[in-house]
Amino acid sequence: MPKASEVKKNTAIEFNNNVYLIRDIERSVPQGRSGGSLYRMRMYDVATGSKLDHTFKADEMINLADLSRHEVSFSYIDGDEYVFMDIADYTPYHFNKDSIADEILFINEETQGLQVLTVDGTPVAIELPANVELVIVETDPSIKGASASARTKPAILSTGLSVQVPEYIANGEKIKINTAEHKFMSRADSK
């Protein structure tokens, strides 16, 4: 059993006789206390989808739920459902568009390293790779000789995600995006 300070995002825990998936963690250090940090966790019930916010002390022990990870690839869209296929055994996993709205901005047919998190065989979340490669579909024209400047411009990517990119980047280029920070990392390696 890990302490609250050791728990990460997208971890499934058992709390109040239910299984919750942690979506967000905020750490705070109260002033005037000699005690440790507090961790406010936003969790969603796996069965009902209801939201729960709870604050744990840093050294409070948390029970982990039985969570499995399955490497998947994006398969197709069926109405409001996104379907992902298990790479090992071709099991389809269906997600409602609203439940993975943040992740959709980083997913296309070529995205590799996706994982579906399941609790007792039920898919509960999509875990993104650390970075993804996406194509710029709309940005201001590139400026020659601008590589030395640190100025940026907005760019819209093939999935609809908007990020700031350096001025020397042009339409049609494939770039690497950090999925945790939603930031430009570099040009993608041309293969």
Curated annotation (Swiss-Prot):
Range of residues in the leader sequence: none
PROSITE patterns (UniProt xref): EFP
Gene Ontology MF, one: translation elongation factor activity
GO process terms (BP): peptide biosynthetic process
SMART domains linked to this entry: EFP, Elong-fact-P_C
Listed GO CC annotations: cytoplasm
SUPFAM superfamilies according to UniProt: Nucleic acid-binding proteins (SSF50249), Translation proteins SH3-like domain (SSF50104)
InterPro entries reported for this sequence: Elong-fact-P_C, NA-bd_OB-fold, Rib_uL2_dom2, Transl_elong_fac_P/YeiP, Transl_elong_KOW-like, Transl_elong_p-like_YeiP, Transl_elong_P/YeiP_cen, Transl_elong_P/YeiP_CS
Source taxon at top rank: Bacteria
Cysteines joined through disulfide linkages: none
Gene3D superfamilies linked: 2.30.30.30, Nucleic acid-binding proteins
UniProt xrefs under Pfam families: EFP, EFP_N, Elong-fact-P_C
Similarity section: Belongs to the elongation factor P family.
Name by which UniProt lists this protein: Elongation factor P-like protein
Protein source organism: Shewanella sediminis (strain HAW-EB3)
High-level lineage: Bacteria, Pseudomonadati, Pseudomonadota, Gammaproteobacteria, Alteromonadales
